[in-house]
Amino acid sequence: MIPFVAGMLSTASEITNVILAGGTQMAAVLALAKSTGYNENKVALGTTSYIINDKDANLLDTVKSISDIPVLSVNPRLKDSKFEGLRAYSTGFVKEGVGAGGSLIASILKTGIDSKKLLELIDKEYSRVSTSQ
């Protein structure tokens, strides 16, 4: 996955803006893409506040040591979820790394919704998926 995304980053950043999403794995993508080249002015990394606040991840320092791109984060407010499984993310029990933060940031930028409304939609979808057969 890392070589593939690094290659995509090299090409895509020449023609459009790119938000890398995938938590700490994207630091590895940046490191590899640095050798192939990419347009730093069109790249940002998007993640959740859980990854930013994870002292074991050390994402901000890692990214800074590789590239001078912006790192954006979103607090999905999962601690306020109706569902214990989602609340586990906010305590650090569950780790993501699937692009959740970048996806949430893109959704907020595209629709203009806030994190409270986003949580309502997340809870609604979680309920739908967890109760469907």
Briefly describe each language-model feature range.
Residues M1-Q133:
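N-terminal loops that bind phosphate or other acidic moieties
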